[in-house]
């Protein structure tokens, strides 16, 4: 493997050249004491979880310089049988371990071998947890060095830090998923890592070795030794950033506002791109032209030419991303402008960034430049990183502070070898590290007060590079935050694709909400601190010996006093919110109460206003006193109050948001309060949400955009775009400025998808009869399909009740049924569902859309209840107050679109087939039921008595299996 192929895209050439010589230099370079008497270790186990699995092999080697001078290898006899998949992975059989020592005996022998020396392991937390779970394991060593984390510091630009990847790249012994072979590989990689550390900027090793000396950190001796090889070197982050940015230059772009019309390919040229042997065929040799895809590409091309908008519903299989990428790329290249693509999901963004755009760039003469742009909190703040590395700020994590030091080292190395980039791929343990210590928000950015602003900053550098790229890929969240920030986050992009557009109204409402949160307020006041902690304390220490300190300290004392009063006052507000939350009806875990006329006229609200007004007054006093301190100090020592200025703006925002909600007269908003019923305290919030997102988009965003392509597989209700056009404001800007297009899927839904309506399920208000009938449908469906069933619930209570009834019956039948329990990871549930072909899942909102499981993994989707918003939902209540027939205009089409999204989980490829079961009796008892059925991708459905569903599914399954 070539180094060029092993590093991340955009790696500077000087870094590639350095990495290319590491293996040779590792053969001759010496590192004295830090490679004498160190132990390299690896283990094999029966599984990943230390709670449920055991050791089956331990291997270790003692290093002295470049030589292995002693070995330790043993199988371990587990109490359980080795799973078949582990045997397949490792080749370790039950016969191999039958006569092996017990875990206690093996670990005791290991402890004798190690003799307290430092232990190196790749992902050391895993090996250490298994070793120390055995009696006597804690005696093996006090010093464990994780070579995985160290590799991220030493080689931050590698595309992967897996041991097998690095061993192959640097010509070390190969990895075979056996402990002894992995140890041999790591022995070679270890020396490469030491050499790579010496290539980092001069003085960095000393900076890392010296930071926060009170924190025990296993890497400190390594960095200290390497620093001693180059004594007296002083590290400059600013100079390191300047070095890495030398070659980072880009051409200026034209603002599309300056162009009277775009130069675009003809319709015939676009058609040729999708023809056999054309551009797309060169990207994908097995590509077959699709009429629907060509029609969409032509529609996108025409929209760009005319400067108008399009709403395109493209069914599954159309290939919509390639349909818009080609004309948008041509628009960017031919006009020297930047175009934008906004997605909802990371999966689609990754598909564009790492697959489709690179392939497209390879086939276009002159290439194509593209980049991803994320929110501020995805990028490291160099000012905060510098202060943390110098020990100028406290480590705020409540977990192991050593993880924070490791994060500093990883990020510092990365920014010294990367012109751009973000935190998401660095492998930092954010559960143990306080992310805000390393990031900033747009409203908190110090800008001109920051020594790295603008060119050396990764946040502003990313924005600058985006402004010079042909194509920018971002997400819906950042797009709408940019609208709220009046264009200060994204470069001026006038041509957009909004993919996965069915969800943008909801996302815009979330991004534009004004929130007063107990948890965020607590963090805010913790950051402000007081006489001994937080930003106020830091300012006092920084100013204690400066000229004018008497004035400054007096202002600090006043700010500390007013902040303490404000903290207590806002806590009283959240106590009042919790009391008001008792009035909320419905809601299993969370109460969501509309702050409407009835509540505002109640005695409870008038009592609550006393604490609310007191808090507003206290917050305003605190805001004034903190701002006075910031202004006074900033005139002389602006760098001292940068952090305090950031927090001061948050304090002002908190006061303004509380005033807005308590006043409640701005008719653009709906007001509500939220309480977590499972907590005695904490989790309370008050929210103001924009009601009419379409109006806001029509006045604040669409006038700035020449062309917006809204694309999704789920936009129409009974073949009408009316609901979507209203939701995004296209019906407010003139009919001539936009048009809509529906493109059928290229898949045969009528043959491959069956829709079953269980019309005899009792009314859910008769809860026991309803649950009993639904239980029978669920059991029969799971048994008939042999698993691979996804059941999508609208509320947790029904889901958990039915899970306790259905799961034991599935277990007796040998079928696995999982449930989206509280605090469970949606990603792990997805992975489990996909990796176990016969497993089934009961799930909530996170699985209604964006969940792809093709083939036999998913054969049946069950929707027990239509996903109407709750009648007590604050937005629904506000709409009902303001409009007649609000339910039919908003709640009904939104529910239809959610059902369409859920149905879309079934057919993800041309060979997929499956059954959608709708078990809500309202589909046949209410007139609106037809809207759901006529909006589905297949026009036919079967109404079947619930007792016959199991038999129908057996016949359906047999018929489709014969077809295969």
Question: Which residues does each predicted region cover?
Answer:
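Conserved non-catalytic scaffold segment of RNase H-like nuclease domains
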Residues: 2-143, 156-177
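Acidic two-metal-ion nuclease catalytic site recognized across multiple nuclease folds
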Residues: 2-30, 191-267
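Acidic, Mg2+-coordinating catalytic module of metal-dependent nucleases/exonucleases
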Residues: 115-135, 156-229
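A substrate-engagement module of RecA-like helicase motors
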Residues: 250-251, 256, 270-278, 336-338, ...
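Conserved pre-motif I regulatory segment
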Residues: 264-312
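Signature of the SF2 helicase/ATPase Hel1-core->accessory helical subdomain module
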Residues: 350, 442-471, 476-614, 714-730
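A contiguous, basic/glycine-rich beta-loop/short-helix subdomain that forms a polymer-engagement track
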Residues: 436-470, 480, 485-487, 615-759, ...
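Conserved RecA-like P-loop NTPase helicase motor core
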Residues: 746, 758-769, 821-924
